[in-house]
A protein has these predicted regions:
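Accessory alpha/beta interaction modules
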Residues: 1-168, 244
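Short conserved micro-motifs at the rims of enzyme active sites and ligand-binding pockets
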Residues: 145-147, 181-185
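Short, solvent-exposed coil/turn linker segments
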Residues: 64, 156, 173, 197, ...
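Short hinge/gating elements
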Residues: 24-33, 172-176, 198, 235
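Extended serine/threonine-enriched, polar tracts that run as long, contiguous segments within proteins
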Residues: 166-168, 175-183
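Conserved, well-folded catalytic cores of nucleic-acid-processing
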Residues: 48-51, 137, 175, 192-195, ...
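Short, charged alpha-helical interaction segments and adjacent helix-coil junctions
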Residues: 2-18, 91-96, 184-285
Length: 285
């Protein structure tokens, strides 16, 4: 019933610039990799780099321009955005809404895939150049780190010496961000992903005047909005399915614990209290 109500509500919802989900996969690919949007993705990349005092770039060329037909056919590249800077550094960007510790391996795999693709067979290793991976996450990946933006490089442990600048992995954990994390350009972009009002963002960073125009173009396109809605539905039902599986897993574990306690002749009332199962459920085990 809830699923039906969600579908009906979302079908009739009027999409505006401010209620548009800025983390939607279709929208992000359009905003950051559609031809003509190079200045927008460049501003975001530079915001990430400035935040940790790395060099910035003057321009980028998008290597995987957004193509709606390919997107709908599932033939778009595995990373959301891939571009190259004026000094031949590759930047890959991915927005991930759900995940766990295995995302670290996934991001390493995507980085390695991009790095290895820089060389054709028999080409000299001197042709290799840095690959920067930027991962924007709508979940917490590193519970032991308070910072919402962390960056990993290849280092020698004893002397803390960086081996090479060819491997750089940025992780931006949106749930960790709060208004006290005011870090100029990057702060504005995080607010954007989290749904900040566009008029406020324009006051902080004039690139959002251009972003606002692209958002409106996206909304005005029926094919794009249809693809956007479809992605929203997919994410909703996937999340709902994962929640059900998680709840069923927890309940199965409770039954197993209760069964073991019952075999140890533990009082049924204590088993019920310990597991949250009713006494009737315990008796049936």
């Amino acid at each position: 019933m809830e699923e039906f109500e969600y579908l009906e509500k979302s079908k009739n919802e009027i999409i505006t610039i401010d209620n548009l989900n800025k983390k939607n996969d279709c929208f992000i690919r359009y905003l950051f990799s559609d031809e003509g949007n190079e200045n927008i993705v460049l501003d975001f990349i530079n915001g990430v780099m400035i935040d940790l005092n790395f060099q910035t770039f003057n321009n980028v060329v998008i290597l995987n321009p957004f193509n709606l037909t390919k997107y709908l056919d599932g033939k778009e590249s595995i990373v959301d955005v891939k571009c190259i800077t004026e000094d031949n550094q590759t930047v890959i960007i991915e927005i991930q809404l759900q995940g766990n510790q295995y995302f670290i391996r996934r991001s390493l795999y995507y980085w390695a895939n991009s790095y290895s693709s820089l060389l054709n067979k028999s080409e000299n290793y001197t042709k290799l150049s840095p690959v920067i991976s930027i991962n924007v996450l709508d979940f917490v990946l590193f519970n032991d780190i308070k910072d919402f933006h962390s960056c990993y490089l290849l280092k020698e442990i004893k002397h803390n010496k960086i081996l090479t600048d060819h491997c750089m992995l940025h992780y931006i954990e949106l749930p960790k961000f709060n208004l006290n994390n005011n870090k100029e350009k990057l702060s504005s972009w995080i607010k954007f992903f989290k749904g900040e009002n566009m008029s406020n963002l324009i006051k902080e960073n004039n690139i959002f005047e251009e972003v606002e125009k692209r958002c409106q173009s996206f909304i005005d396109s029926d094919p794009l909005i249809n693809a956007y809605r479809k992605k929203e539905w997919n994410e909703y039902f996937y999340k709902d399915m994962m929640n059900v599986e998680r709840e069923e897993g927890i309940k199965s574990e409770k039954y197993l614990i209760a069964k073991n306690l019952k075999q140890m002749n533990i009082d049924k009332a204590l088993i019920s209290k310990a597991t949250g199962l009713s006494i009737e459920e315990v008796e049936k085990l």
